[in-house]
Amino acid sequence: MRDRVRRSAVMLIVAAIVILIDQGTKTLALNTLRQDARIPLIGDWLGLQLAFNPGAIFSLGEGSTWVITVVGLAVTAALIGAATRARNVWSAVGFGFIVGGAIGNLIDRLFSPPAFGIGHVTDFLAYGNLFIGNLADVALGIGAVCLIVAGLRTSRRRPDPASRPDPVDPVPAEETVHP
């Protein structure tokens, strides 16, 4: 029980840090960047440019922002429930990144213009000409990698039942040889 509480605390701390950093960088982006100008960081590969995303990843579903918000709330609640059952610290950290990223983007959907529940997510990390994202999106990716690592570590610890030797039957007492 104590380990479960510790892992839940790890998840909550990671999620809180992700939310704070995500919302802080979005505020900074809103105050310093423009939609019509890109600041290159690594050539044309990575830059800073303000964008507002009414949809999901790659702006999919941009006409259904309220649906994305409702689905996002449900998925986030399910993730928090799953996170409380994390089996190891890697899983707790992974769920923390994912929950923090999901909540970071939900805050935008709930409280950013144009209106409550249909707000646009603030994006500012321009990946070439592919898409523009934010640190919540990065946290979602990091969390997924952590969960994969946790799964690989767990599967390595569990021996394959097929590889276990058959149990040895004890020799019946009447067949025991006495010197």
Residue ranges and their predicted role:
Residues 1-179:
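Alpha-helical transmembrane bundles and membrane-interface segments of multipass inner-membrane proteins
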